[in-house]
Amino acid sequence: VTNNDLNENELTNYLSAIISYNNQQNQDSLSYFNSSKALVKKRDNYLRKYIFSLAINQKVKKAIQEIKILENKKDFDFFESQVLLTLDSILKEKYEESENYLEYLNELKSSSVYENAIYDTLTLYLSTFKNKKLIFQKSNFDNLDLLNITFLKCYLEDDTTSKSFHTLVN
């Protein structure tokens, strides 16, 4: 991005958005991001922080819309955007699409525990929703496994759900 590409107002709003975002002033941050939206096509980091700001302000549907608008731009691919797209397609019962997002999410994820736990959880939920049965594969996250199995048994109305809840809380 060259200096000629930047509008002074957009840049001021963008910087205010970043400062507000970093200070956890979420509503102010979102307002400033919305005022500097033209920067989406010019700044890679803008979209990520804008999406986070939308999600923090409970505007997840709007965040997903924004990601979909720029979905084919490689510069804007980041782990959390793919998580949102995966969740959106699972909720809409578009399981093939969900599998594609998960496959791509697997490529994007780093070796962080956080990203691996999210990926494993999404994979388990997608498999269960798609197949209408629990096909469990143990992960490295025992407590998370127990929580997920309990909720999925509840979703499937499994006879052992009460026992799973009892195990979970004890």
In which residue ranges do the predicted regions lie?
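Residue-level signature for tetratricopeptide repeat
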Residues: 19, 52-53, 88, 122, ...
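Alpha-helical adaptor scaffolds
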Residues: 51-56, 67-72, 120
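N-terminal leader/linker segments that initiate helical-solenoid repeat arrays
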Residues: 1-50, 56, 64-65, 77
